Amino acid sequence: MIQDPLVYLDISIDKKPIGRIVCKLFREKAPKTTENFYKLCAGDVKSPLKDQQYLSYKGNGFHRVVKNFMIQAGDIVFGTQKDSSSSSVGKGGCSIYADKEEVKTDDESFCYGNFEDENLGEFVEPFTLGMANLGSPNTNNSQFFITTYAAPHLNGKHSIFGQVVHGKSVVRTIENCRVDSDGVPESDVRISDCGVWEKTMGVPLYNASNDQIGGDVYEEYPDDDTHFGDDDFGKALEAANIIKESGTLLFKKKDYSNAFFKYRKSLNYINEYMPEPDVDKERNIQFINLKMKIYLNLSLVLFNLERYDDAIMYATYLLEMDNVPNRDQAKAYYRRGNSYLKKKRLDEALQDYIFCKEKNPDDEVIEQRIEYVNRLIEENKEKTRKNISKFFS
Protein backbone atom coordinates (compact mmCIF):
# COMPACT_ATOMS: atom_id res chain seq x y z
CA MET A 1 0.00 0.00 0.00
CA ILE A 2 1.35 3.43 -0.98
CA GLN A 3 2.02 6.22 1.48
CA ASP A 4 -1.22 8.03 2.43
CA PRO A 5 -3.41 6.05 -0.01
CA LEU A 6 -6.66 7.40 -1.42
CA VAL A 7 -9.96 5.52 -1.33
CA TYR A 8 -13.47 6.43 -2.44
CA LEU A 9 -17.03 5.93 -1.27
CA ASP A 10 -19.83 6.40 -3.81
CA ILE A 11 -23.02 7.51 -2.07
CA SER A 12 -26.65 7.01 -3.02
CA ILE A 13 -29.80 8.13 -1.23
CA ASP A 14 -32.92 6.05 -1.83
CA LYS A 15 -31.04 4.42 -4.73
CA LYS A 16 -30.41 7.80 -6.37
CA PRO A 17 -26.69 8.54 -6.92
CA ILE A 18 -25.44 11.60 -5.05
CA GLY A 19 -21.68 11.65 -5.57
CA ARG A 20 -18.25 10.43 -4.54
CA ILE A 21 -16.32 11.00 -1.32
CA VAL A 22 -12.53 10.63 -1.67
CA CYS A 23 -10.52 10.09 1.52
CA LYS A 24 -6.80 10.32 2.20
CA LEU A 25 -5.64 7.79 4.79
CA PHE A 26 -2.90 8.45 7.36
CA ARG A 27 -0.87 5.29 6.94
CA GLU A 28 2.14 6.43 8.98
CA LYS A 29 0.10 7.73 11.91
CA ALA A 30 -2.41 4.87 12.03
CA PRO A 31 -1.04 1.91 10.03
CA LYS A 32 -3.33 -0.83 11.33
CA THR A 33 -6.47 1.30 11.15
CA THR A 34 -5.56 2.49 7.68
CA GLU A 35 -4.92 -1.05 6.45
CA ASN A 36 -8.32 -2.11 7.76
CA PHE A 37 -10.22 0.77 6.13
CA TYR A 38 -8.27 0.44 2.88
CA LYS A 39 -9.04 -3.27 2.60
CA LEU A 40 -12.71 -2.79 3.47
CA CYS A 41 -12.93 -0.25 0.64
CA ALA A 42 -11.02 -2.52 -1.75
CA GLY A 43 -13.22 -5.48 -0.76
CA ASP A 44 -10.56 -8.12 -1.36
CA VAL A 45 -10.41 -9.83 2.05
CA LYS A 46 -12.43 -13.03 2.46
CA SER A 47 -15.17 -12.69 5.02
CA PRO A 48 -15.51 -14.84 8.15
CA LEU A 49 -19.21 -13.94 8.20
CA LYS A 50 -21.65 -16.53 6.89
CA ASP A 51 -23.64 -14.28 4.56
CA GLN A 52 -20.74 -12.42 2.92
CA GLN A 53 -18.04 -13.68 0.57
CA TYR A 54 -15.75 -10.67 1.07
CA LEU A 55 -15.58 -8.00 3.72
CA SER A 56 -16.54 -4.70 2.14
CA TYR A 57 -18.21 -1.38 2.76
CA LYS A 58 -20.05 -1.75 -0.55
CA GLY A 59 -23.79 -1.69 0.10
CA ASN A 60 -23.33 -0.51 3.67
CA GLY A 61 -25.66 2.12 5.09
CA PHE A 62 -25.10 5.26 7.13
CA HIS A 63 -27.03 4.44 10.29
CA ARG A 64 -26.41 7.56 12.38
CA VAL A 65 -26.32 11.21 11.36
CA VAL A 66 -26.00 14.14 13.76
CA LYS A 67 -26.00 17.61 12.22
CA ASN A 68 -23.01 19.77 13.15
CA PHE A 69 -21.26 16.68 14.49
CA MET A 70 -20.76 13.63 12.28
CA ILE A 71 -22.09 10.92 9.94
CA GLN A 72 -21.50 7.25 10.83
CA ALA A 73 -21.46 3.98 8.88
CA GLY A 74 -19.52 0.73 8.71
CA ASP A 75 -21.64 -1.84 10.53
CA ILE A 76 -20.99 -4.57 7.98
CA VAL A 77 -22.62 -7.20 10.20
CA PHE A 78 -26.11 -5.63 10.20
CA GLY A 79 -25.83 -2.45 8.16
CA THR A 80 -25.35 -4.09 4.78
CA GLN A 81 -28.41 -6.31 5.09
CA LYS A 82 -31.54 -4.70 3.67
CA ASP A 83 -33.79 -6.68 6.02
CA SER A 84 -31.96 -5.80 9.24
CA SER A 85 -34.11 -4.03 11.81
CA SER A 86 -33.17 -0.46 12.63
CA SER A 87 -32.65 -1.50 16.24
CA SER A 88 -29.88 -3.91 15.20
CA VAL A 89 -27.96 -1.66 12.82
CA GLY A 90 -25.09 0.01 14.63
CA LYS A 91 -24.50 -2.85 17.05
CA GLY A 92 -22.17 -4.87 14.83
CA GLY A 93 -18.87 -4.64 13.03
CA CYS A 94 -16.13 -6.80 11.60
CA SER A 95 -12.54 -5.86 10.82
CA ILE A 96 -10.16 -7.62 8.45
CA TYR A 97 -8.43 -9.01 11.55
CA ALA A 98 -11.39 -11.23 12.51
CA ASP A 99 -11.35 -14.97 11.79
CA LYS A 100 -14.02 -17.63 11.41
CA GLU A 101 -13.25 -19.19 14.79
CA GLU A 102 -13.91 -15.91 16.60
CA VAL A 103 -17.19 -15.42 14.75
CA LYS A 104 -18.22 -19.00 15.46
CA THR A 105 -17.45 -18.97 19.19
CA ASP A 106 -18.50 -15.41 20.09
CA ASP A 107 -22.26 -15.66 20.60
CA GLU A 108 -22.57 -12.56 22.80
CA SER A 109 -21.02 -9.81 20.70
CA PHE A 110 -21.54 -8.97 17.05
CA CYS A 111 -18.30 -6.98 16.86
CA TYR A 112 -15.44 -9.09 15.54
CA GLY A 113 -11.74 -8.54 15.04
CA ASN A 114 -11.48 -5.66 17.49
CA PHE A 115 -8.07 -3.99 17.37
CA GLU A 116 -6.10 -1.38 19.26
CA ASP A 117 -6.38 2.40 19.14
CA GLU A 118 -3.96 4.52 17.12
CA ASN A 119 -3.37 8.25 16.74
CA LEU A 120 -5.71 9.36 19.52
CA GLY A 121 -5.50 13.01 18.55
CA GLU A 122 -7.75 16.05 18.50
CA PHE A 123 -10.83 16.47 16.31
CA VAL A 124 -10.30 20.13 15.47
CA GLU A 125 -11.35 20.08 11.80
CA PRO A 126 -14.47 18.91 9.95
CA PHE A 127 -14.15 16.05 7.46
CA THR A 128 -11.88 14.05 9.74
CA LEU A 129 -12.17 10.24 9.64
CA GLY A 130 -12.36 8.51 13.00
CA MET A 131 -13.04 4.97 14.17
CA ALA A 132 -16.17 4.30 16.18
CA ASN A 133 -15.67 1.95 19.12
CA LEU A 134 -17.59 0.18 21.87
CA GLY A 135 -17.04 2.95 24.39
CA SER A 136 -13.83 1.50 25.76
CA PRO A 137 -10.21 1.46 24.55
CA ASN A 138 -9.01 -0.87 21.79
CA THR A 139 -12.45 -1.89 20.50
CA ASN A 140 -12.19 -0.79 16.86
CA ASN A 141 -13.64 -2.98 14.10
CA SER A 142 -15.30 -1.61 10.96
CA GLN A 143 -17.56 1.22 12.07
CA PHE A 144 -16.26 4.70 11.26
CA PHE A 145 -17.45 8.28 11.23
CA ILE A 146 -16.71 11.51 9.37
CA THR A 147 -16.90 14.69 11.41
CA THR A 148 -18.80 17.66 10.01
CA TYR A 149 -17.66 20.07 12.70
CA ALA A 150 -14.95 20.29 15.33
CA ALA A 151 -15.60 17.67 18.03
CA PRO A 152 -13.34 18.34 21.04
CA HIS A 153 -15.34 15.95 23.24
CA LEU A 154 -13.92 13.09 21.14
CA ASN A 155 -10.31 14.10 21.70
CA GLY A 156 -8.15 11.23 22.89
CA LYS A 157 -10.99 8.70 22.65
CA HIS A 158 -11.07 7.67 18.98
CA SER A 159 -8.47 6.76 16.38
CA ILE A 160 -7.97 9.42 13.71
CA PHE A 161 -6.94 7.84 10.44
CA GLY A 162 -7.79 10.11 7.51
CA GLN A 163 -9.56 13.09 6.02
CA VAL A 164 -11.93 13.88 3.16
CA VAL A 165 -10.11 15.52 0.24
CA HIS A 166 -12.90 15.51 -2.38
CA GLY A 167 -16.67 15.32 -2.17
CA LYS A 168 -17.21 17.45 0.91
CA SER A 169 -20.58 18.52 -0.46
CA VAL A 170 -21.62 14.86 -0.52
CA VAL A 171 -20.83 14.63 3.20
CA ARG A 172 -22.96 17.75 3.73
CA THR A 173 -25.80 16.19 1.75
CA ILE A 174 -25.77 13.20 4.10
CA GLU A 175 -25.51 15.48 7.12
CA ASN A 176 -28.59 17.42 5.99
CA CYS A 177 -30.78 14.32 5.58
CA ARG A 178 -33.89 14.15 7.72
CA VAL A 179 -33.40 11.86 10.71
CA ASP A 180 -35.53 10.47 13.51
CA SER A 181 -35.06 11.20 17.20
CA ASP A 182 -32.20 8.68 17.37
CA GLY A 183 -30.31 10.17 14.45
CA VAL A 184 -31.29 7.38 12.04
CA PRO A 185 -31.76 8.75 8.49
CA GLU A 186 -35.32 8.57 7.21
CA SER A 187 -33.90 7.92 3.73
CA ASP A 188 -31.78 4.94 2.72
CA VAL A 189 -28.26 6.41 2.61
CA ARG A 190 -25.78 3.84 1.28
CA ILE A 191 -22.27 3.30 0.03
CA SER A 192 -23.23 2.06 -3.43
CA ASP A 193 -19.62 1.39 -4.39
CA CYS A 194 -16.14 1.85 -2.96
CA GLY A 195 -12.52 1.11 -3.73
CA VAL A 196 -9.03 2.48 -4.23
CA TRP A 197 -9.06 5.89 -5.93
CA GLU A 198 -6.82 7.34 -8.63
CA LYS A 199 -7.03 10.81 -10.21
CA THR A 200 -8.04 9.38 -13.57
CA MET A 201 -11.25 8.07 -11.97
CA GLY A 202 -12.63 11.54 -11.28
CA VAL A 203 -15.08 12.67 -8.61
CA PRO A 204 -18.65 12.21 -9.90
CA LEU A 205 -21.22 14.57 -8.41
CA TYR A 206 -24.93 14.53 -9.18
CA ASN A 207 -26.54 17.22 -7.02
CA ALA A 208 -23.95 19.96 -7.61
CA SER A 209 -21.20 20.78 -10.12
CA ASN A 210 -17.49 20.42 -9.39
CA ASP A 211 -16.49 21.47 -12.92
CA GLN A 212 -13.66 24.02 -12.54
CA ILE A 213 -14.45 25.74 -15.83
CA GLY A 214 -13.86 29.48 -15.55
CA GLY A 215 -11.66 29.07 -12.49
CA ASP A 216 -14.24 27.88 -9.96
CA VAL A 217 -12.06 26.13 -7.37
CA TYR A 218 -14.36 26.89 -4.44
CA GLU A 219 -16.15 24.40 -2.21
CA GLU A 220 -19.87 23.89 -2.72
CA TYR A 221 -20.67 25.07 0.80
CA PRO A 222 -19.16 28.47 1.70
CA ASP A 223 -18.43 27.37 5.28
CA ASP A 224 -16.15 24.62 3.95
CA ASP A 225 -14.04 26.89 1.75
CA THR A 226 -10.62 28.05 2.94
CA HIS A 227 -9.60 30.46 0.16
CA PHE A 228 -10.44 33.58 2.17
CA GLY A 229 -11.57 34.72 5.60
CA ASP A 230 -15.10 35.49 6.76
CA ASP A 231 -14.52 39.26 6.67
CA ASP A 232 -12.71 39.43 3.33
CA PHE A 233 -15.71 40.75 1.43
CA GLY A 234 -13.67 41.61 -1.67
CA LYS A 235 -12.40 38.05 -2.09
CA ALA A 236 -15.85 36.67 -1.38
CA LEU A 237 -17.37 38.91 -4.05
CA GLU A 238 -14.68 37.82 -6.49
CA ALA A 239 -15.45 34.16 -5.73
CA ALA A 240 -19.20 34.65 -6.23
CA ASN A 241 -18.51 36.34 -9.59
CA ILE A 242 -16.16 33.56 -10.72
CA ILE A 243 -18.75 30.93 -9.81
CA LYS A 244 -21.44 32.86 -11.71
CA GLU A 245 -19.24 33.11 -14.80
CA SER A 246 -18.52 29.40 -14.53
CA GLY A 247 -22.26 28.84 -14.70
CA THR A 248 -22.56 31.11 -17.73
CA LEU A 249 -19.86 29.15 -19.57
CA LEU A 250 -21.78 25.96 -18.88
CA PHE A 251 -25.04 27.62 -19.95
CA LYS A 252 -23.47 28.57 -23.29
CA LYS A 253 -22.57 24.90 -23.74
CA LYS A 254 -26.26 24.10 -23.08
CA ASP A 255 -25.28 22.21 -19.94
CA TYR A 256 -28.28 23.64 -18.14
CA SER A 257 -28.26 21.32 -15.11
CA ASN A 258 -24.69 22.18 -14.14
CA ALA A 259 -25.24 25.85 -14.98
CA PHE A 260 -28.12 25.83 -12.49
CA PHE A 261 -25.88 24.25 -9.85
CA LYS A 262 -23.29 27.00 -10.38
CA TYR A 263 -25.80 29.85 -10.16
CA ARG A 264 -27.26 28.31 -7.01
CA LYS A 265 -23.77 28.02 -5.55
CA SER A 266 -22.98 31.65 -6.39
CA LEU A 267 -26.18 32.71 -4.65
CA ASN A 268 -25.14 30.76 -1.56
CA TYR A 269 -21.83 32.64 -1.46
CA ILE A 270 -23.64 35.95 -1.86
CA ASN A 271 -26.05 35.19 0.98
CA GLU A 272 -23.22 33.95 3.20
CA TYR A 273 -20.78 36.84 2.74
CA MET A 274 -22.81 39.94 1.83
CA PRO A 275 -21.99 42.55 4.52
CA GLU A 276 -24.58 44.79 6.11
CA PRO A 277 -24.65 48.36 4.73
CA ASP A 278 -23.31 49.82 7.98
CA VAL A 279 -20.32 47.45 7.82
CA ASP A 280 -19.31 47.96 4.18
CA LYS A 281 -21.83 49.95 2.14
CA GLU A 282 -19.90 49.77 -1.15
CA ARG A 283 -19.51 45.98 -1.02
CA ASN A 284 -23.13 45.60 0.07
CA ILE A 285 -24.27 47.37 -3.10
CA GLN A 286 -21.94 45.25 -5.25
CA PHE A 287 -23.28 42.04 -3.71
CA ILE A 288 -26.88 43.19 -4.24
CA ASN A 289 -26.20 43.98 -7.91
CA LEU A 290 -24.67 40.54 -8.38
CA LYS A 291 -27.65 38.97 -6.64
CA MET A 292 -29.97 40.61 -9.17
CA LYS A 293 -27.99 39.05 -12.02
CA ILE A 294 -28.08 35.64 -10.34
CA TYR A 295 -31.87 35.78 -9.91
CA LEU A 296 -32.22 36.57 -13.62
CA ASN A 297 -29.83 33.79 -14.59
CA LEU A 298 -31.60 31.28 -12.37
CA SER A 299 -34.95 32.19 -13.88
CA LEU A 300 -33.55 31.70 -17.39
CA VAL A 301 -31.76 28.41 -16.76
CA LEU A 302 -34.75 26.96 -14.91
CA PHE A 303 -36.96 27.89 -17.85
CA ASN A 304 -34.63 25.92 -20.09
CA LEU A 305 -34.85 23.02 -17.65
CA GLU A 306 -38.65 23.23 -17.93
CA ARG A 307 -38.92 23.95 -14.21
CA TYR A 308 -41.39 26.75 -14.78
CA ASP A 309 -42.60 27.21 -11.21
CA ASP A 310 -39.02 27.69 -10.02
CA ALA A 311 -38.31 30.06 -12.91
CA ILE A 312 -41.33 32.12 -11.83
CA MET A 313 -40.12 32.11 -8.23
CA TYR A 314 -36.67 33.55 -8.99
CA ALA A 315 -38.05 36.18 -11.36
CA THR A 316 -40.44 37.20 -8.59
CA TYR A 317 -37.56 37.40 -6.10
CA LEU A 318 -35.90 39.97 -8.34
CA LEU A 319 -39.08 41.99 -8.81
CA GLU A 320 -39.53 42.16 -5.04
CA MET A 321 -36.09 43.76 -4.57
CA ASP A 322 -35.58 47.51 -4.21
CA ASN A 323 -33.97 49.77 -6.80
CA VAL A 324 -33.96 47.23 -9.62
CA PRO A 325 -33.03 48.90 -12.95
CA ASN A 326 -35.84 49.06 -15.50
CA ARG A 327 -33.98 46.84 -17.96
CA ASP A 328 -33.58 44.10 -15.35
CA GLN A 329 -37.22 44.42 -14.34
CA ALA A 330 -38.16 44.03 -18.01
CA LYS A 331 -36.08 40.84 -18.26
CA ALA A 332 -37.71 39.44 -15.12
CA TYR A 333 -41.24 40.20 -16.37
CA TYR A 334 -40.41 38.69 -19.75
CA ARG A 335 -38.96 35.49 -18.29
CA ARG A 336 -41.76 35.11 -15.79
CA GLY A 337 -44.27 35.76 -18.56
CA ASN A 338 -42.67 33.04 -20.69
CA SER A 339 -43.02 30.60 -17.80
CA TYR A 340 -46.66 31.55 -17.26
CA LEU A 341 -47.24 31.03 -20.97
CA LYS A 342 -45.73 27.54 -20.83
CA LYS A 343 -48.10 26.77 -17.96
CA LYS A 344 -51.01 28.14 -20.05
CA ARG A 345 -51.70 30.84 -17.47
CA LEU A 346 -52.45 33.30 -20.24
CA ASP A 347 -53.83 36.22 -18.22
CA GLU A 348 -50.75 36.29 -15.98
CA ALA A 349 -48.44 35.93 -18.99
CA LEU A 350 -50.17 38.85 -20.72
CA GLN A 351 -49.93 41.03 -17.63
CA ASP A 352 -46.19 40.36 -17.30
CA TYR A 353 -45.59 41.08 -20.98
CA ILE A 354 -47.42 44.39 -20.59
CA PHE A 355 -45.27 45.25 -17.56
CA CYS A 356 -42.20 44.28 -19.59
CA LYS A 357 -43.29 46.66 -22.36
CA GLU A 358 -43.68 49.47 -19.84
CA LYS A 359 -40.14 48.95 -18.54
CA ASN A 360 -38.62 48.53 -22.01
CA PRO A 361 -40.90 50.26 -24.55
CA ASP A 362 -38.46 49.90 -27.46
CA ASP A 363 -38.52 46.09 -27.42
CA GLU A 364 -40.29 44.93 -30.59
CA VAL A 365 -40.24 41.26 -29.56
CA ILE A 366 -42.41 41.88 -26.53
CA GLU A 367 -45.03 43.58 -28.72
CA GLN A 368 -45.23 40.38 -30.76
CA ARG A 369 -45.64 38.37 -27.55
CA ILE A 370 -48.49 40.56 -26.40
CA GLU A 371 -50.27 40.14 -29.73
CA TYR A 372 -49.71 36.38 -29.63
CA VAL A 373 -51.14 35.94 -26.12
CA ASN A 374 -54.09 38.22 -26.88
CA ARG A 375 -54.86 36.03 -29.88
CA LEU A 376 -54.70 32.88 -27.72
CA ILE A 377 -57.02 34.43 -25.16
CA GLU A 378 -59.54 35.38 -27.86
CA GLU A 379 -59.35 31.88 -29.37
CA ASN A 380 -60.07 30.37 -25.95
CA LYS A 381 -63.01 32.71 -25.47
CA GLU A 382 -64.38 31.72 -28.87
CA LYS A 383 -64.07 28.03 -28.01
CA THR A 384 -65.89 28.66 -24.76
CA ARG A 385 -68.70 30.52 -26.53
CA LYS A 386 -69.12 27.67 -29.03
CA ASN A 387 -69.19 25.06 -26.27
CA ILE A 388 -71.83 27.03 -24.38
CA SER A 389 -73.96 27.46 -27.50
CA LYS A 390 -73.81 23.69 -28.15
CA PHE A 391 -74.96 23.06 -24.60
CA PHE A 392 -78.12 25.16 -25.07
CA SER A 393 -78.89 24.12 -28.65
Curated annotation (Swiss-Prot):
State its Enzyme Commission number(s). Answer: 5.2.1.8
Matches recorded under Gene3D superfamilies: Cyclophilin-like, Tetratricopeptide repeat domain
**Which residue numbers delimit the PPIase cyclophilin-type domain?**
8-196
SUPFAM superfamilies according to UniProt: Cyclophilin-like, TPR-like
The TPR repeats extend over: 240-273, 292-325, 330-363
Task: Give, as one word, the top-level EC class.
Answer: isomerase
A Gene Ontology molecular function term for this protein is: unfolded protein binding
Show the GO cellular component annotation of the record: cytoplasm; cytosol
Q: Which Pfam families match?
A: Pro_isomerase, TPR_1
Q: Write down the PROSITE patterns for this protein, in alphabetical order.
A: CSA_PPIASE_1, CSA_PPIASE_2, TPR, TPR_REGION
Q: Which UniProt keywords apply?
A: Isomerase, Repeat, Rotamase, TPR repeat
Its UniProt entry gives the catalysed reaction(s) as: [protein]-peptidylproline (omega=180) = [protein]-peptidylproline (omega=0)
Q: Which InterPro entries match?
A: Cyclophilin-like_dom_sf, Cyclophilin-type_PPIase_CS, Cyclophilin-type_PPIase_dom, TPR-like_helical_dom_sf, TPR_rpt
Record GO biological process: protein folding; protein refolding
Query: Extra info from the record?
Result: Present with 3230 molecules/cell in log phase SD medium.
What PANTHER family does UniProt report for this protein, alphabetically?
PEPTIDYL-PROLYL CIS-TRANS ISOMERASE (PTHR11071), PEPTIDYL-PROLYL CIS-TRANS ISOMERASE D-RELATED (PTHR11071:SF561)
Q: How does it assemble?
A: Interacts with RPD3 and CNS1.
Protein purpose: PPIases accelerate the folding of proteins. It catalyzes the cis-trans isomerization of proline imidic peptide bonds in oligopeptides. Plays a major role in negative regulation of the heat shock transcription factor (HSF).
Q: What is this protein called?
A: Peptidyl-prolyl cis-trans isomerase CYP7
The encoding gene is CPR7
